[in-house]
Amino acid sequence: MENNKQDDHQEEFIFRSKLPDIYIPNHLPLHSYCFENISQFKDRPCLINGATGEIITYADVDLTSRKVAAGLDKLGIKQGDVIMLLLQNSPEFVYAFLAASYIGAIITTANPFYTPAEVAKQAAASKTKLVITLAGYIDKVKEFTGGESGVKVMCVDAPPPESECLHFSELTQADETEIPAVKIHPDDVVALPYSSGTTGLPKGVMLTHKGLVTSVAQQVDGDNPNLYFHQNDVILCVLPLFHIYSLNSILLCGLRVGAAILIMQKFEISKLLELIEKFKVTIAPFVPPIVLSVAKCPDLHRYDLSSIRTVMSGGAPMGKELEDAVKEKLPHAKLGQGYGMTEAGPVLSMCLAFAKEPFPIKSGACGTVVRNAEMKIVDPDTGASLPRNQSGEICIRGKQIMKGYINDAEATKGTIDEGGWLHTGDIGFIDNDDELFIVDRLKELIKYKGFQVAPAELESMLISHPNITDAAVVPMKDEAAGEVPVAFVVRSNGSKITEEDIKQYISKQVVFYKRINKAFFIEEIPKNPSGKILRKILRAKLVTEQAI
């Protein structure tokens, strides 16, 4: 729906969901909201531990989370304190996150594969008081924990001998009746993820109780939820919970509706397919690299995947060719995309094929703006809002967006304008059916003699080639053109595809300025946990290639 209004003599084009706004109880603390209806499903499975097969009920997850909350208080963690989770997916991750919400503490999540320097930087910036991790990662935190630092470390597995490391059982054995009485304000921060930093240094994103409650409700609440999850669903959680997409759209949305959440520690294709078959997974949230692995898996036919009713993809755009490949392999499943950004809380748009009463959708679209929010497309140069079918920067406004970047008023001001609009840095357009199409990142566009070349477009073509497993396209400096597109390509097993083959394959499909200038073959495309290509690394590789 589009509202036109006059503002300083400039027409505003504002887009809303096709679904009506709903009542959202965003006065509730996050844990109270997630477990608001727990009496209806307290004896049902809440978490399934993929590594052990253990099934934990909603009643037990809530009880353990409250014990952990009391234990954290006993340990000296108070309202407003920050706890870092340096963990892979595990039940303990869930208990710690919910426990922090109970006592008004804040969780900052860190990638266990970070270097010690990256972990230390995040711990210092967030003023972390406690790190919960695995014994194998203790070396990453020893520089800034223990002794005079006052920062405690806790392991969820057996701590290394002779270390000061506490054990998670100290929390789970606490008395849940001793949770302190805290008054949680809806604007209090509950999660502090660090945005990927692909466009600068990582910054702490302040997500509040109100913001996350709003975001979850926008997805799964209402008579016709945009994302229809229910108590009988088994939701696959293979995407890392330290990333907001998984934390919000899988864990929190799953808890809210009483679904079972199947936790996998890490992605491994045969184990993933085995668990889908064993536990009859119904909802499969993926990122494009996993979608690609499933679509190209030669053993797919050996597994019964007929239980899957929904395949969600987010984190990075998924091309039409990849969509078609998945539809062919999983014809019974609904496939669609959502679009998110950590700072936006994170979901901006969601595929309406996922609704309880679904709408028709177009291939390549990444959904319609979520309900109870507004979206506009603005000209990156003038800031003017644009009508349908015109590409510009995507902006969103609503109670789900971040409070701001922690201790960085300037960066906050550069992202959220005075009107409350969050500027994403992504380029896209909204079509006549209210569907959003992402064209590319503002900063990733390749400029060939002034022509814009979108890497995502070329990447989807490359990936559709049977002899290519994965690909990324970045700009290379060129005296005549300014920039030309070059490809980094991962060959399929045993493939002998050449640079010349690739150039010809693309040149047949695109206008002259989009042709691939060079192709480099590599083992793996570097990506962040959400599946976004780390173009900085590839551009750095290019510089060394050109210097040779």
From Swiss-Prot:
It is an enzyme of class 6 (ligase). ATP binds at residues 195-203, 337-342, 426, 438-441, 532. It is found in: Cytoplasm. It holds the Pfam family AMP-binding. The keyword ATP-binding applies. InterPro entries: AMP-bd_C, AMP-bd_C_sf, AMP-binding_CS, AMP-dep_synth/lig_dom, ANL_N_sf. Mostly expressed in glandular trichomes (lupulin glands) after flowering, and, to a lower extent, in stems, leaves, cones and flowers. Pathway: Secondary metabolite biosynthesis. Residues 338-405 are annotated as: SBD2. Gene3D superfamilies: 3.30.300.30, N-terminal domain of ligase-like. Its EC number is 6.2.1.12. GO terms for cellular component: cytoplasm; cytosol. Keywords: ATP-binding, Cytoplasm, Ligase, Nucleotide-binding. Both substrate-binding domains (SBD1 and SBD2) are involved in the substrate recognition, and are sufficient to confer the substrate specificity. Involved in the biosynthesis of prenylated phenolics natural products which contribute to the bitter taste of beer and display broad biological activities. Catalyzes the ligation of CoA on (E)-4-coumarate to produce (E)-4-coumaroyl-CoA. Belongs to the ATP-dependent AMP-binding enzyme family. This is 4-coumarate--CoA ligase CCL1.
